[in-house]
Regions:
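Outer-membrane beta-barrel initiation region
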Residues: 2-114, 121, 198-223, 306, ...
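Flexible, solvent-exposed coil segments and beta strand-coil junctions
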Residues: 41-47, 75-83, 133-142, 184-195, ...
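Transmembrane beta-barrel strands of outer-membrane/channel proteins
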Residues: 51-55, 83-89, 102, 113-131, ...
Length: 390
């Protein structure tokens, strides 16, 4: 029979006979799920939009969204296509960022194609306090802007993704990125550039591979599970010949309920970052701070060649509530962090610590809200956020 829009799938490794398939397209694959008739595997699409609202001293108020469109067709791994769009605006700096990530199933047998892109405005900001484990914080006298760095970032990253049946994921790809730092007067970064003679604009090409394994009983508030990851990569400057470095970032986290009903959970995370070679920019250093490691400090508070931290939380589910939109659970948690960075030619035995806690809301494992207050030698740090995940 004729049918220009008809696809015929069958096993590549088996003997097949096809008759009268004029106009149809033939695709042979050994993928079991594709070749097996599954009447309950329907073609459908889902759309999800989650607002992101938050606050921390570095960003001020944050408003944004995370939108995901997923299509389930004949060939799924675990879906046929998925497009994710995200955007955020930061009121303290008037900066914004835009992101896109698309995934397309079975580009090569069980491998998916991922396309990712990111853009930040010229006044999007990160922090920089210098290189070293004992850098000083002058917020009390010079205010927070002194260590803010305005940086524009453009990134495009195509990758291949393989997923295992039990929660494993392997991604490998290349990246092209361009970054421009504004040498703002009366800020620490301007002094750093003048002292070190650094270039404020750079473009990089990179290759990386990342392995992740996740096995959690719940996505937003896990009571039992483990997550592990390993990222290995290499980046080279397109402008400065010989400027290149490699990096290794391992991580491991556990969630374990301490009572049978899962209301009391112990959670811990370990993460390290190793830069191999010395030819990296300050924004490529191994950094720890409020959003990655030490919740009582400012973002990117300490930067070095190597970093390590551990977070440990004790979480308690106080009460379950029924609302007109989603069933929600209210909980409280306390946490302790420790970590440090290492830099060549620095003799430091100091380990930084922070401690605190807060409240969280979990809405049907779809959306969470968090309010936290952590303390450190730099003083207290308050933050809250609404989004997905703990």
């Amino acid at each position: 029979s004729e049918g220009s829009n008809t696809w015929i799938y069958d096993h590549r490794s088996k003997k097949n006979t096809f008759r009268k398939i004029k106009g149809a397209k033939l695709r042979l694959t050994n993928d079991y799920d594709t070749n097996t008739y599954q009447p309950l595997k329907l073609r459908n699409s889902t759309r999800q939009i989650i607002p992101t609202v938050g606050f921390n001293p570095d960003d001020g108020m944050k408003l944004g969204f995370n939108a995901t469109n997923t299509f389930y067709g004949l060939r799924q791994n675990p879906y046929t296509t998925q497009h994710n769009y995200n955007a955020a605006y930061y009121f303290a700096t008037n900066g914004f960022e835009l992101g896109y990530k698309g995934e397309f199933a079975h580009i090569f047998e069980n491998w998916n194609l991922e396309l990712a892109a990111r853009f930040t405005s010229p006044n999007f900001s990160i922090n920089f306090f210098g290189i070293g484990n004992e850098t000083e914080n002058f917020d009390d006298t010079l205010e927070m802007d002194y260590n803010r760095v305005k940086i524009q970032h453009l990134n495009f990253s195509p990758s291949l993704i393989w997923r295992g049946q039990l929660g494993a994921k392997l991604r490998t790809g290349i990246s092209l990125e361009s970054l421009e730092v504004e040498e703002t007067e009366d800020r620490f970064v301007n002094t750093f550039y003048q002292t070190n003679g650094e270039e404020n604009r750079n473009s990089f090409i990179g290759v990386d591979a990342e392995y992740n394994f996740e096995n959690l009983d719940k996505a937003a508030f896990p009571t039992m599970g483990m997550t592990t990851g390993l990222l290995i990569g290499y980046k080279a400057s397109l402008e400065n010949q010989g400027q290149a470095y490699a990096y290794i970032v391992p991580s491991l986290s556990f969630d374990h309920k301490l009572v049978s009903n899962g209301r009391l959970v112990l959670a811990s995370k370990w993460k390290a970052h190793f830069n191999l070679g010395d030819e990296y920019e300050f924004y490529q250093a191994a950094s720890i701070g409020g959003i990655d490691g030490l919740r009582g400090f400012r973002n990117q508070r300490f930067s070095g060649k190597t970093s390590y931290y551990q977070n440990t939380d004790l979480r308690y589910n106080l009460k379950s509530l029924k609302t007109g939109l989603l069933p929600v659970t209210l909980g409280v948690y306390g946490g302790f962090d420790y970590g440090r960075v290492w830099t060549p030619n620095e003799d430091s035995d100091l380990w930084h610590t922070s401690y605190g806690g807060g409240f969280f809301l979990n809405g049907a494992d779809v959306m969470t809200a968090r309010l936290a207050l952590f303390n450190s030698l730099d003083g207290p740090r308050f933050s809250f956020g609404v989004g997905f995940g703990f």
